[in-house]
Amino acid sequence: MKKLILSLTLFSLLATTAQPLLAQAPPAPAPAAAAAKAPEPPKKADPNVEQRIADLEAYIGNGARGSADAKANVTSKLDDVAGPGHNGFMMVCAALVLFMTLPGLALFYGGLVRKKNVLSVVAQCFGIAGLVTILWFVCGYSLVFSAGSPYLGSFSKFAFLNGVTAAPNTDYSAWVSQNVFSMYQLMFAIITPALIVGAVAERMKFSAILLFVTIWMFAVYFPLAHMVWGVDGLMNGVWNGDAKIKAIDFAGGTVVHMSSGWSALVLCLILGPRLGHGKTPMQPHSMALCAIGTGMLWVGWYGFNAGSAVAADGIAGNAFMTTTLAAA
């Protein structure tokens, strides 16, 4: 018992003596990595007054500071930023061009066919819009608007719209972003094969139309659009100084109307007339629907023509006025 009491007393004395020694122990030194802070990158100098004025003039003129060429580098605070005014204008124009197809063309063609074929024609217009959108997303935009050969663009550069961002599209318009430009051109790709539907109405099934459009986009539209509109296209008289044919196709006279018109004629010759044509009366289902569709096409054409200026500028205004007079 005495040994136990002595042991406990000795342990208490040792604990009491060691406590102040532990309290006075110096703290561990801070790691060297935490003490040294990473150097901050130098801040870019703000542009001076003259540069700011040049930026505003370039924005209004839809170009880059110090150059009328939209391909020049924009070395300013506005670098990598698309112009909100031009971008907003182009988004409205893109919606108007889609409005021409859905529901403009669908109602226009639906009113001209017989009652039993109205739904078929409308479904074909909607089906084409969805199909072409997928093709455009996968590789269509890349085949048309990337640099490749004079006949066709690169398959992979913008595949799945990779790299198509909100940054300015310096190949075609410095103050319109790449994604907005891509969506605007998609609406042209949608309406072009949809125009062919009217020539083969009541003579091709829905599945046959979609198969034809898929082949036609790769065989006709993508190569022709690149040759006329591509930055290194064979017939691009605007951007390609080495173009063999100096064509200026402002709003798709060649890419949209000639391609769809000639293709529709070929299809008509292959398919022949409708069964009973010239023997059985084939009255239009509804001229009211046809008239409504015509009005929608008129409205949508402002986006089609004015938007082809790729800027809210004087050229777009001139196209807007000319479209009104031509329609009247």
Predicted regions span which residues?
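Hydrophobic alpha-helical transmembrane bundles of multi-pass membrane proteins
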Residues: 3-8, 20-328
